[in-house]
Amino acid sequence: MKEHSIDIQLSHPDDLFHLFGSNERHLRLMEEELDVVIHARTEIVQVLGEEAACEEARQVIQALMVLVNRGMTVGTPDVVTAISMVKNDEIDKFVALYEEEIIKDNTGKPIRVKTLGQKLYVDSVKQHDVTFGIGPAGTGKTFLAVTLAVTALKRGQVKRIILTRPAVEAGESLGFLPGDLKEKVDPYLRPVYDALYQILGKDQTTRLMEREIIEIAPLAYMRGRTLEDAFVILDEAQNTTIMQMKMFLTRLGFNSKMIVNGDISQIDLPRNVKSGLIDAQEKLKNIHQIDFVHFSAKDVVRHPVVAQIIRAYEPAPVKNEEREEVQEEIE
């Protein structure tokens, strides 16, 4: 097939650095993911390759240049998102992701959605009392949930944040680990702590936890409570039983929001126990103030190979097939 060539005119020589990053790491990423060769010289970017691939590269570069011209810093996640969107014929929606800033992190860096799935998730949380975020790791579910909770707290929309998860892990018997239940579960809540530290900083997070404005606790600690004026997040919800999920959801009080996050491809419950997350999808789908947002490999904002790994496991994971047979027997 004949090699195609496209020249893209930039506004300023400095645009090359802002667009392609230090050591041209973004340029190499585009070349690898789009199967093109890119030559960057002063204010001209030349793209070589098959015509369709060159056109995709042109669209990615022009979309990223909109951010550069607005004075935004283009990072690797932005390039990954643009590449993913052009491959899914969604590049025309790329710039819209950057129109709204959710909040600034501890260093003053704006936090925005990175994919269309994330935007749908954020909009759903704003519009519903209970939002389920279901999808693979790397799609930003936990980080976005914590971001939205902190935003609501800072705006005075809620008085506290409660973060919880079930105490079930594959290959770990918590009963044989030292410490009480909270101490046993804390290491598994690391992604939640990481998100809080990035958004609030470690010192402020610690102060808010000491004042019990932020509470991080195992799911078992939710029993018997009514959670009012609170933003409540349940992570790793695929590992709840049906009764645990019912118990959690019925804790919802007035002026509260709930987010339930999980990945139904990573269930660690015993084979004969049905996941409360799967059950909730079936039973609650027609309730007006409850919404389900499904993420896919398209929403992965980690290294591009992670999305490829997720896709490789999506068609027919053995674990899921076995589980579906068991679920049918249970029902």
What would you call each of these model-derived segments?
Residues 87-109, 113-116:
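Conserved loop-to-helix interface motifs that mediate assembly, gating, or partner/ligand docking
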Residues 15-32:
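Short amphipathic alpha-helix segments
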Residues 28-29, 34-37, 43:
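Compact, well-ordered interaction domains used in eukaryotic information-processing assemblies
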Residues 13, 24, 51-52, 239, ...:
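Short, surface-exposed acidic/glycine-rich loop or hinge patches that mediate macromolecular interfaces
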Residues 19, 57-60, 245:
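Hydrophobic side chains in well-ordered alpha-helices
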Residues 1-18:
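Short glycine-/aliphatic-rich beta-strand segments at the starts of folded cytosolic domains
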Residues 44, 106-234, 238-331:
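Conserved helicase motor core of SF1/SF2 NTP-dependent helicases
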Residues 39-98:
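Interdomain "pre-motor" coupling segment immediately N-terminal to P-loop NTPase/helicase cores
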